[in-house]
């Protein structure tokens, strides 16, 4: 499963991928507009870049392009400003900030569900 994080105008504020483990980053693609590709040529982002064609500069066409050009049949599209939380083991109401291992577990469970 590939994780696509579409982003624009925030090369130094990547909230979503800050929650990802190194293993999860290997499956993540940061989708950027052609006009901004040089701004995202920074570690750790530069190794995961997917640059859109120059005529695509809005969110809806970006999502459509990802859908039509993905490398796999299982993928997730996410915004670049997400935070993650989970419920604690002894409460059904309190939320706890998720660490990278929690987020990786979430994606593992999602992939398992997509396979069943």
Which sequence ranges carry the predicted segments?
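Well-ordered, non-membrane alpha-helical segments in soluble/globular domains
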Residues: 14-19, 95-112
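Structural alpha-beta junctions
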Residues: 22-29, 44-50, 108-116
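Short, well-formed alpha-helical segments that are part of the catalytic scaffolds
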Residues: 3-24, 36-44
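Active-site-proximal specificity loops/subdomain of glycosyltransferases
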Residues: 31-78, 83-103
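A structural signal for isolated positions on well-ordered beta-strands in alpha/beta enzyme cores
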Residues: 2-4, 29-31
């Amino acid at each position: 499963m590939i994780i696509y994080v579409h982003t624009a105008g925030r090369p130094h504020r990547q909230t979503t991928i800050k929650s990802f483990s190194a293993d999860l980053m290997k499956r993540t693609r940061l989708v950027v507009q052609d006009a901004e590709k040089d701004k995202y040529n920074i570690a750790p982002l530069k190794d995961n870049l997917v640059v859109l064609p120059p005529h695509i500069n809005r969110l809806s066409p970006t999502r459509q392009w990802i859908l039509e050009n993905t490398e796999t049949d299982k993928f997730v599209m996410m915004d670049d400003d997400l935070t993650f939380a989970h419920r604690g083991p002894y409460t059904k109401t309190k939320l706890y900030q998720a660490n990278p291992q929690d987020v990786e577990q979430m994606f593992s469970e999602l992939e398992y569900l997509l396979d069943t």
